[in-house]
């Protein structure tokens, strides 16, 4: 629930549930998820990220301090991820070209060859990284990536600006009224 719903609402339910739950193992697991979700709330520092790009170079999130970083956790086998690439990525990049945004694509579900083939096939421009192993990968764990596509916006200060950011097609169809628009336009 912490991954998909408003954190404030789930925090209330979590507090009430803790009062009545008698299964300590379940409570420990829930506490772990709560702690991870809590760390990802807007204003908190984004977890350190160190991944390899398609050329084998190590890339860190901290390399982009002073810029917005729109992170797209995606998968080669993810239909909705591919749909976004095909239908929105170019319009999205064009619309926001004046906002100093780095587009970071982190592939979580495949090996290196399939990932590189997908980068070429979908002409992914931006920072392309791989976090093989998905739920087992430390970056995916730190960012609480439970499903894909999963989007986040990191602020210019390196802190989380939006923990559950909308996908590009939703932002484009909002006509400038999305949370994404409010955050980036508020920085100019």
Question: Where is each model-derived feature located?
Answer:
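Oxidative protein folding and maturation machinery
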Residues: 1-59
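Short, internal strand/loop/helix patches
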Residues: 50, 116-157
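Generic structural signal for well-ordered beta-strand positions
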Residues: 59-60, 161
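Conserved redox-active cysteine motifs that mediate thiol-disulfide chemistry
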Residues: 65-66, 73-90
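Active-site acidic short loop of glycosyltransferases
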Residues: 65-67, 98, 124, 145
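Alpha/beta-hydrolase fold active-site loops
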Residues: 68-69, 149
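Structural microenvironment flanking redox-active thiols in thiol-disulfide oxidoreductases
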Residues: 82-122, 134-141
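Thiol-/selenol-based redox modules, centered on thioredoxin-like
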Residues: 153-188
């Amino acid at each position: 629930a912490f991954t998909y719903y408003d954190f404030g609402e789930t925090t209330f339910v979590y507090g009430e549930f803790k009062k009545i739950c008698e299964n300590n193992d379940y409570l420990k697991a829930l506490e772990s998820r709560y702690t991870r979700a809590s760390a990802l709330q807007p204003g908190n520092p984004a977890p350190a990220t160190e991944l390899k790009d398609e050329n084998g170079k190590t890339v860190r999130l901290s390399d982009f301090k002073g810029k917005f970083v729109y992170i797209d956790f995606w998968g080669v086998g993810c239909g909705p991820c591919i749909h976004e690439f095909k239908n929105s990525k170019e319009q999205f990049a064009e619309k926001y070209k004046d906002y100093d945004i780095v587009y970071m694509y982190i592939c979580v579900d495949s090996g290196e060859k399939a990932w590189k083939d997908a980068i070429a096939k979908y002409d992914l421009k931006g920072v392309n990284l791989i976090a093989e192993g998905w739920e087992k990968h430390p970056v995916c764990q730190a960012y609480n990536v439970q499903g894909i596509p999963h989007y986040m916006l990191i602020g210019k200060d390196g802190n989380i600006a939006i923990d559950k950011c909308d996908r590009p097609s939703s932002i484009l169809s909002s006509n400038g009224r999305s949370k994404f628009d409010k955050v980036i336009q508020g920085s100019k």
